[in-house]
From Swiss-Prot:
One of its GO terms (cellular component) is cytosol. InterPro entries: Arg_succ_lyase_C, Argininosuccinate_lyase, Fumarase/histidase_N, Fumarate_lyase_CS, Fumarate_lyase_fam, Fumarate_lyase_N, L-Aspartase-like. Keywords: Amino-acid biosynthesis, Arginine biosynthesis, Cytoplasm, Lyase. This is Argininosuccinate lyase. It is an enzyme of class 4 (lyase). GO terms for biological process: arginine biosynthetic process via ornithine; L-arginine biosynthetic process. The gene is argH. It is found in: Cytoplasm.
Length: 457
């Protein structure tokens, strides 16, 4: 049953109906539409449209419908209803008769869908925050188990300075903390109810919209009806949150793909998150990580698409805004799936400590320590930087590590270098000296793990 039609003398072309209908995707708002309808029925009692007995009948029927939806949400798709609002109203009329036709009094699908979508977004934010925290917990536990796993840190994908696998894990804990805080900020701005704003000019019934907002679990009601039915900022914000979050997961995936490669060989991934080749029997491919990396693009695309949909729309509601849902649903589903998969990848990862240490000892990752040593001897840093660069060239010429050069070789670049330089160039010394907050020293990493555990567990 269409919720309109009196104005029309011809039925809609079936091709237009298929083009126009949205039930195939907005069926996901069924629970929110029913919850909003229950609250609206209560509001109609306060203005005399419904009496208490009528409201009870409607609420009971809606509660039964909610149970049916929760038991089998996909059954909705068998209907030819235009959208989820039409479907709910039709089902309600089936249960209570003409009384169901009174429920839409004073309400428009414009404020109805805006309310439904905000309720759905609130629930999704909670789900995403939980998944973010679970991944953070997995990272912290992996870090705690690998505090002694020394590995090279990279800039420009070249070995730069030694770090630990634990320190690498904690870097992503911080990124995810920002992701969670962005979700929380988004929630603060979307936590206002548009219900009662009608099509665009507000409802003609003196409904207490603040009370109505409270019944629905919103912090307050919106202030302007025209803005309320036009607003999709929360969709853009959530898509932005998802896009940034997926960038972080893509970087996480790329790091581990490299660490797992034969060239690095720092980690082994579990068989549970890898696959083989149909031709090459030896292959063990990091498919879970590659899919996380690959899915980043579709989320970015959803954000770009929604930006383009909204950029030229006049106030208030336009049918273009029906395009707000499919991209949002897919993007948040994708982000949630990738968060869960990233945690699964960490469950069973094996860090190959000897290989990590071997790599950290190569590539002259202790060169900065030699520069700092010279500074401590009174050499200006810029001059020390140049001296160490020359020493590295000599080490490369001899095919040796810096710490393997003879003292006489080092002293040809600076006479202040003495025997005390060799302990400074040791790998562990490179870590131990990074004692400032956020550094890679064992004490700082242990402190960061303890702080993260206190915050996340």
């Amino acid at each position: 049953m269409a919720l309109w039609g009196g104005r029309f003398s011809q039925a809609a072309d079936q091709r237009f109906k298929q083009f126009n209908d949205s039930l195939r995707f907005d069926y996901r708002l069924a629970e929110q539409d029913i919850i909003g309808s229950v609250a609206w029925s209560k509001a109609l009692v306060t203005v005399g449209v419904l009496n208490a007995d009528e409201q009870q009948q409607l609420e009971q029927a809606l509660s039964v419908l909610l149970e049916e939806v929760q038991a089998n949400p996909h059954a909705i798709l068998a209907s030819d209803a235009e959208d989820i609002h039409s479907w709910v109203e039709t089902k309600l009329i089936d249960k209570v008769g003409d009384l169901g036709k009174k429920l839409h009094t004073g309400r428009s699908r414009n404020d109805q869908v805006a309310t439904d979508l905000k309720l759905w977004c609130k629930f999704q934010i909670t789900e995403l925050q939980t998944a973010v925290q679970q991944l953070q917990q997995a990272l912290v536990m992996t870090a705690e188990a690998n505090q002694d796993a020394v590995m090279p840190g990279y800039t420009h994908l070249q070995r730069a300075q030694p770090v630990t696998f634990a320190h690498w894990c904690l870097a992503y804990v911080e990124m995810l903390s920002r992701d969670e805080s962005r979700l929380q900020d988004t929630l603060k701005r979307l936590d206002v109810s548009p219900l009662g704003c009608g099509a665009l000019a507000g409802t003609a019934y003196a409904i207490d919209r603040e009370q109505l907002a409270g019944w629905l679990g919103f912090a307050s009601a919106t202030r302007n009806s025209l803005d309320s039915v036009s607003d999709r900022d929360h969709v853009l914000e959530l898509l932005s949150d998802a896009s940034i979050g997926m960038v972080h997961l893509s970087r996480f995936a790329e790091d581990l793909i490299f660490f797992n490669s034969g060239e690095a060989a720092f980690v082994d991934l579990s068989d549970r998150v890898t696959s083989g080749s149909s031709l090459m029997p030896q292959k063990k491919n990091p498919d879970a990580l590659e899919l996380i990396r690959g899915k980043c693009g579709r989320v970015q695309g959803a954000l770009t698409g929604m930006m383009m949909t909204l950029k030229g729309l006049p106030l208030a509601y336009n049918k273009d805004m029906q395009e707000d849902k499919e991209g949002l649903f897919d993007a948040l589903d994708t982000w949630l799936d990738c968060l869960h998969m990233a945690a699964l990848v960490l469950d069973g990862i094996q860090v190959k400590r000897p290989r990590c240490k071997e790599a950290a000892e190569q590539g002259y990752a202790n060169a900065t320590e030699l520069a700092d040593y010279l500074v401590a001897k009174g050499v200006p840093f810029r001059e020390a930087h140049h001296i160490v660069g020359e020493a590295v060239v000599e080490a490369i010429r001899q095919g040796k590590a810096l710490e393997a050069l003879a003292l006489s070789d080092l002293q040809q670049f600076s006479s202040v270098i003495g025997d005390d330089v060799y302990p400074i160039l040791a790998l562990q010394s490179c870590l131990d000296k990074r004692v400032a907050k956020g550094g890679v020293s064992p004490q700082q990493v242990a402190s960061a793990i303890a702080e993260a555990k206190a915050r996340l567990f």
